Curated annotation (Swiss-Prot):
Glycans are attached at residues 181, 291, 545. Residues 1-23 are annotated as: Disordered. Keywords: Glycoprotein, Membrane, Transmembrane, Transmembrane helix, Transport. Its main location: membrane. It comes from the Eukaryota. The chain crosses the membrane at residues 31-51, 67-87, 97-117, 130-150, 159-179, 186-206, 225-245, 253-273, 297-317, 332-352, 360-380, 393-413, 425-445, 501-521. It is found in: Membrane. Efflux pump; part of the gene cluster that mediates the biosynthesis of the mycotoxin fusarin C. Within the cluster, FUS1, FUS2, FUS8 and FUS9 are sufficient for fusarin production. The other FUS cluster members are not essential for fusarin C biosynthesis. This is Efflux pump FUS6. Disruption phenotype: Does not alter fusarin C production. It comes from Gibberella fujikuroi (strain CBS 195.34 / IMI 58289 / NRRL A-6831) (Bakanae and foot rot disease fungus).
Amino acid sequence: MASAKDAQPAPEKSLSSDPQPEPSKKGARFWLIFVAISLTTFLAALDTSIISTALPTITADLGSESLYVWIIDAYLLASTATIPIFAQAANIYGRRSLTLIAVCIFTLGSGLCGGAHNTAMMVGGRAVQGIGGGGILTMSEIVVCDMVSIRERGMYAGIIGGVWAIAAVVAPVMGGAFAQNISWRWIFYINLPIAGVSLVALGLFLKLSRPPSGTFKEQMSRIDWGGSVLLIGSVTSIVLALSWGGSEHPWSGWQTIVPLVIGLLALVAFFAYQGAPWLREPTMPLRLFSNRTSSTLLVISFIHSLLLYWICYFLPVYFQAVKEASPTRSAVMLFPIACTSAPAGVAAGITITKTGKYRVWHFTGFVLMSIACGLFTLLDAQSSTGRWVGFQILFGVGTGTVFTSTLPPILASLPDSDVATATGAWTFIRNFGSIWGVAIPAAVFNNHVNHAAPKISDSSVKSLLVDGGAYEHATQHFIKSLSPNPDLKTQVIQVYLEGLKVVWQVSLAFCLLGFILCFFVRSLTLRDELNTEFGLKEEKPNSNNMSSEEGVVRD
């Protein structure tokens, strides 16, 4: 059990005066579990964006043109809203059972989507997938945190972050390839054998300890039902507003403003409720935000996730509308971010494990991202491949180092008993940031296009681009259709470039905000010992006592 001492982080010590022990060697069982967790993380990350390039084919086949947005949003909504719930339930029902349940739910959702014959079944399947995906993302981080010490977590977080980055970037390419060459249904069916292998491996090797949690009635009474309802309602309203804004309805319309205000008020009510004295186990306890380091790093994680999605959603606009790349080609053109963020994150994690120092990676990451976002403003129709590749490399290295270096110090500033809730909060805030990382630049882009559109001489083309139409028409097909009129094509591309320039400028402001926040993070000692009630059970032959902790039961 965590002691009061665990809750008080100590200042970072000099390595020369206090040498740290080498990390313990991991056996085959550990690596089998870690590979299985990484595979499920890859699948959950893959399904956040794999349908983006295949969506036109799916909607045409199912006849769901008017509801296409929900094929995307159902997954995002379900995964984000259920993350803190899985984190809390992991403390009550154990890590192993929740991990297996999450993988099973995700697999079921994949099967439903692959076999969908109408839009309702597809949206329902995506929602089921999202619940499982949110659980996988949460439980994978929690289980890894229970298997290694805080000091070692940076390295493994870097690997998982690399898996996520690679999946997010290759997903559109895979989706387009399946839709064009085989069938869009295999976008979902491919998950079944991979998830099945992971499920078997986790079932066989993921044997964890957990403390007694009482009777079924006692377990149910520990769940924060009120907080869960408020959080799900809040996320649902906010996602609705951000999905409708600028597309179905104008940002200034009541259809957008009302659900957005309701969602934000529900979020405020959720956090107020989390501080209620009668609440036994809050979904997201306020103590997670009670110290400067954890609260600052959670905000930094929000900004980092926002920026990652910001860039990954709007660079394809540049590639397709300005460089006239196909959707699949534009996805390939994003590879520099994935190919650099993954190794950079792993390298930063290894360094953190060896030295215990993490603040330098916060500063380094935001400096590199700031430089990259500033350089993005220089991109135009004549920019060489070397330019947009080089700028992405800077951003990829920066985003990889920040991702790896945020969770370990958050956990170091809190008692070990808060591992699950803190990890769940970190994962939720990252997902929540990704929602705004698409909505904010979209609003900025659409607003500037509306102001720049009068420069377009053709009124019919102008009408296609205003009020949110520019993002929808940022395609190779649309731009090439203007080729018979070179002057008009140049005008349209210039409007896109002006809108994108403002998008990059605003992203730079968020990078600088993240950099400033880095100064508020304290240097803490990353604990070398693993102190948890939910750790990996040691195989002890000829012994019925499978845990050194009295009262610990099999999960």
